A protein has these predicted regions:
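Eukaryotic scaffold repeat domains enriched in small/polar residues
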Residues: 23-390
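N-terminal secretory signal peptides that target proteins for export/translocation
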Residues: 1-10
Length: 390
């Protein structure tokens, strides 16, 4: 069996340290999408007031205190719907709240029958439906906006690799999937392929589209076992309803991908001063992999990934950078749909909120509002909504 470890572990409860992956299938091909020339931006954006400090105002708080309708153990997978409502995933829960924070329903029903699931990997709120993806059994479950079950669509993928739903548009679902890289010999840095899959809503037909390689440190074993530490990941967010804004490299590079055309329509970056990571703690060094009785700790990296997360709204793509200041917060770069570096600002939030802004899936941008998961010192969770006026 193969094990995959995120190199940078979250500082709150997560899934067990190792995620088991079955090593099957062939190595995904290179990024096939044809791109235009990379848009090169200077270190400073066009906005005259770039670099200002923005302090969001707390609008509301959702907690599990005083309710038996739901509980927060590890809320994640935050998504907003066109009506401003919020959805998220937790243990045996798919929770929906309206834009004012009022609890609507839990759509999770355990089982293998119609409308039932054993676990959920993603939820996709769209204009007329609310859709959840269950990896086991692999299917898409449709609900109306009132939370009533409508139907389900089996996803008959030939691969057993993990699939993550990214986007639904024009009758097609788009997923990210990955394969464990085939390697032999000493531990090494390798490309780990992440492919985009298109699944037809009408027929369930699956088509493999472009692949976006990420970087991983892989340990192999002559016995067939092995594992890897993810160094970069594919971060992809819906942009203008039908596109994906994404990044998958350690150095600064963003892309706008049209999955319907299977084509990168824009690549862009800006001059960026790279940030060194904090040294590994003794606890981190002791963690890692045990392969054939030998311990492998996470590799020491020279730099952090330049772009830690992506958010999008209207014609803007927000790149959450690795640049952080104790007094100012995190530096956010703002690009338009043409790849032009328009603006930048420091996002100043409580430290618990900033941790969620860095990690994909733990925050969601909806117009002037930012939903964020926060963990308090007493180990409890809350979801907060902030008004962000830039």
């Amino acid at each position: 069996m193969r094990k995959t470890f995120p190199l940078e572990k979250y500082r709150w409860p997560i899934l067990p340290a190792g995620i088991l992956l079955v090593w099957i299938g062939s190595f995904a091909g290179p990024d096939r999408a044809l791109a235009q020339a990379i848009v090169e931006n200077p270190a400073k954006p066009k906005a005259a007031n770039a670099g200002r400090v923005v302090v969001p105002q707390e609008a509301l708080v959702i907690s599990d205190e005083g309710t038996s309708d739901y509980y927060f153990k590890w809320p994640r997978g935050l998504k907003t719907a066109p009506d401003g409502s919020l959805s998220l995933i937790d243990e045996s829960q798919v929770l929906r709240f309206d834009k004012s924070g009022k609890f609507l329903q839990n759509l999770f029903k355990k089982g293998q029958g119609p409308g039932e699931v054993n676990n959920v990997s993603a939820c996709l709120p769209v204009v007329k439906n609310f859709i959840i993806h269950s990896p086991y059994p692999n299917k898409l479950v449709f609900f109306d906006l009132a939370g009533k079950y409508e139907r389900e669509l089996p996803v008959r993928s030939e691969t057993r690799s993990m699939m993550t739903a990214l986007l639904f548009h024009g009758g097609t679902f788009y997923f990210e999937t990955r394969e464990f890289p085939r390697v032999k010999g000493d531990p090494d840095y390798v490309d780990s392929p992440h492919s985009i899959l298109a699944v037809s809503e009408a027929t369930g037909e699956i088509k493999t589209l472009s692949a976006f390689p990420t970087r991983a440190f892989v340990v192999s074993s002559p016995s067939g076992g092995g594992g890897m530490f993810d160094i970069t990941s594919l971060i992809a967010v819906p942009f203008k309803e039908r596109l994906l804004a994404l990044t998958h490299t350690s150095e600064y590079l963003l892309k706008i991908y049209n999955p319907e055309a299977d084509k990168i329509i824009r690549e862009f970056r800006r001059a960026y001063e790279r940030v060194k990571p904090e040294p590994l703690t003794e606890e981190q060094k002791k963690g890692g992999l045990i392969i054939d009785g030998k311990h492998y700790g996470p590799p020491e990296l020279k730099f952090q990934n330049d772009v830690r997360n992506l958010l999008a709204r209207c014609d803007e793509i927000w790149a959450v950078t690795s640049t952080k200041d104790k007094a100012k917060g995190i530096l956010i770069d703002v690009f338009d749909g043409e790849g032009v570096y328009r603006d930048s600002f420091w996002l100043k939030l409580p430290e618990a909120a900033l941790k969620s802004v860095i990690y994909p899936g733990f925050c969601a941008l909806d117009g002037d509002f930012l939903w964020v998961v926060e963990r308090s010192e007493d180990e409890t969770f809350a979801v907060k909504k902030y008004r962000v006026v830039i």
